[in-house]
Amino acid sequence: MTQRYRVTVAYDGTDFAGFQVQPKQRTVQGTLEKALTKMSKGAYIQVYGSGRTDSGVHAMGQVVHFDYPSELPAKSMLRALNSLLPLDMEVVDSQLADDDFHARFSTVGKRYMYRVDLGHYTNPFKRRYTGHYPYPIDVERIKAALSDVMGTHDYTSFAAAGGVIKDKVRTIYEATVVYNEAENELIFEFHGNGFLYNMVRILVATLLEIGNGRRDVHDFLRLYEVKDRQQARSTAPASGLYLKEVYYK
């Protein structure tokens, strides 16, 4: 009798080639499956994630599910996995799940965070965990623009090439920015019902250009209309992006 588990994982994405298994690459999915295979004495156990994170993207709350060949208490699964995982990955929560739970298809929303270091020079201790924008920024302009980010829109201009999803309409419930004076960082957060490929990184890059005065405060309204990726142009680095939380019914 197999038991389905819902597991929440945190990881430093710097040294992973993304979430999804790739031949001869170190990936989050592959690392989890390797640990589970060892636990199950060689039986292959497939891991399903809430979504793929790219190389260099971090997670505080990536959710996965898998079917294990025997039932262990949830806390025992957490301890066993953590004893086998590398130092840049940790299981932060483990729960027994119903058979109809699916880490990807049961989601109703996600929350992402993006950190931007505003220092004049690249900080060697932050470069793996933040984006870097060494230009003048008016945070009030960004806050004004965020009101246009929220709502239901066609985000075609903010979807990178390579995505396979045709429907580009998404709803952003919350979009915020906070200036952390102690760290000289901007902290963006976005909560939506779903996100397109590289969407958060493109949104952040566009907001930074608005904050710098390179774009009109309400340029998002124009970008929704033109539906042209080339009009948004820039993509913020993967290093500043964190999958913070995945929401379920």
Swiss-Prot record:
Isomerase as UniProt keyword: yes
EC code: 5.4.99.12
GO molecular-function terms, A-Z: RNA binding; tRNA pseudouridine(38-40) synthase activity
Catalysis: reaction(s): uridine(38/39/40) in tRNA = pseudouridine(38/39/40) in tRNA
Catalytic residue list: D54 (nucleophile)
Keyword Isomerase tagged: yes
Pfam families, per database record: PseudoU_synth_1
Any one Gene Ontology BP term: tRNA pseudouridine synthesis
UniProtKB keywords: Isomerase, tRNA processing
Enzyme class: isomerase
Residues where substrate binds: Y112
Family: Belongs to the tRNA pseudouridine synthase TruA family.
Subunit organization: Homodimer.
Biological function: Formation of pseudouridine at positions 38, 39 and 40 in the anticodon stem and loop of transfer RNAs.
Protein name per its UniProtKB record: tRNA pseudouridine synthase A
